[in-house]
């Protein structure tokens, strides 16, 4: 089956899901779309897609149903809740779940779907809104290899790299590792920008110089300037990263491992959420230094 033959549904049209859906449409795929808020189904870049009133409608008569929703409860709701997709998915179809959820939630969903002849792949992505728009997301997949090959043509539209880590749940575990790295790198850049500013250094030159050295990172290259200007354009929502760190910390607990940096960053994010900054980018961690920098 060629990619143009695939019948595809998509549930979740948020900051990451919407540009993913737009890229699928631009690639010529017929697409059924649903989002729980119903606000973006008629987006002009989705012209030609079929807007669906429920996840069940989006999953009816499709070969692949893509999910990109906010958390474990949302995945459970759109699959198994009232008007959930599981009731309408055809035997032999594949659920491609690009949400970031607990590995145990992914495993449980896969088992429930398996009983009705539906395959499930956990395929969280990394790369933020920039990667979603450009179609260069990194896909971290867990699940049956044959099912993964069936959906690979879609993954190659939304992602620049597709990595398979084994059984269902492994993709989510790798995403947990990714979010630990994001926590440390963003927090370090925020601290470094605060220190350099307090010392009176020419920070644009500092960032340019350090970006090509051993301290260079994606966060430094792409978020330092915004931090210095007090601007935090949305790449990945701070509140969602806080949720993801909770998943990572639970995974660490399960193997008797303490993650002190991630614990601290999660506490800092909780403070910022309490101040009303949860919908800003993770780089808003720099706000913790506003009063001293």
Residue ranges and their predicted role:
Residues 31, 51, 120-121, 162, ...:
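Hydrophobic beta-strand scaffold residues
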Residues 1-67, 93, 98, 129:
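NAD(P)+-binding Rossmann beta1-loop-alpha1 motif at the extreme N-terminus of oxidoreductases
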Residues 172, 181, 216-281, 293:
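Interdomain hinge/lid region at the active-site interface
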Residues 38, 55-60, 64-65, 71-137:
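Rossmann-like NAD(P)(H) cofactor-binding subdomain of soluble oxidoreductases
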Residues 100-180:
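Rossmann-fold dinucleotide-binding core
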Residues 134-142, 167-199, 210-222, 240-243:
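Active-site-proximal catalytic alpha-helix in oxidoreductases
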């Amino acid at each position: 089956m060629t990619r143009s033959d695939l019948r595809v549904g998509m549930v979740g049209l948020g900051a990451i899901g919407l540009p993913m859906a737009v890229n699928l449409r631009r690639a010529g795929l017929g697409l059924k779309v649903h989002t729980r808020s119903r606000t973006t189904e008629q987006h002009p870049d989705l012209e030609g897609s079929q807007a669906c009133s429920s996840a069940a409608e989006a999953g009816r008569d499709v070969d692949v149903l893509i999910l990109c929703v906010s958390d474990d409860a949302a995945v459970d709701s759109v699959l198994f809740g009232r008007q959930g997709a599981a009731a309408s998915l055809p035997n032999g179809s594949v659920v491609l779940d690009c949400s970031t959820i607990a590995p145990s939630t992914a495993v449980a969903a896969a088992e429930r779907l398996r009983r009705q002849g539906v395959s499930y792949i956990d395929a969280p992505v990394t790369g933020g809104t920039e990667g979603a728009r450009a179609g260069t997301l990194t896909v971290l997949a867990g699940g049956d290899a044959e099912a993964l090959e069936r959906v690979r043509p879609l993954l190659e539209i939304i992602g620049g790299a597709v990595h398979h880590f084994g059984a269902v749940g492994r993709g989510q575990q790798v995403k947990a590792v990714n979010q630990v790295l994001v926590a440390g790198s963003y927090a370090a850049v925020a601290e470094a920008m605060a220190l350099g500013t307090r010392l009176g250094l020419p920070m644009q030159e500092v960032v340019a110089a350090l970006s090509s050295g051993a301290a260079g990172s994606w966060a430094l290259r792409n978020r330092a300037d915004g931090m210095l200007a007090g601007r935090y354009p949305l790449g990945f929502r701070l509140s969602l990263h806080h949720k993801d760190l909770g998943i990572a910390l639970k995974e660490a607990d399960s193997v008797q491992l303490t993650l002190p940096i991630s614990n601290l960053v999660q506490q800092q994010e909780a403070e910022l959420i309490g101040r009303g900054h949860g919908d800003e980018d993770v780089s808003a961690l720099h706000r913790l230094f506003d009063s001293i920098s």
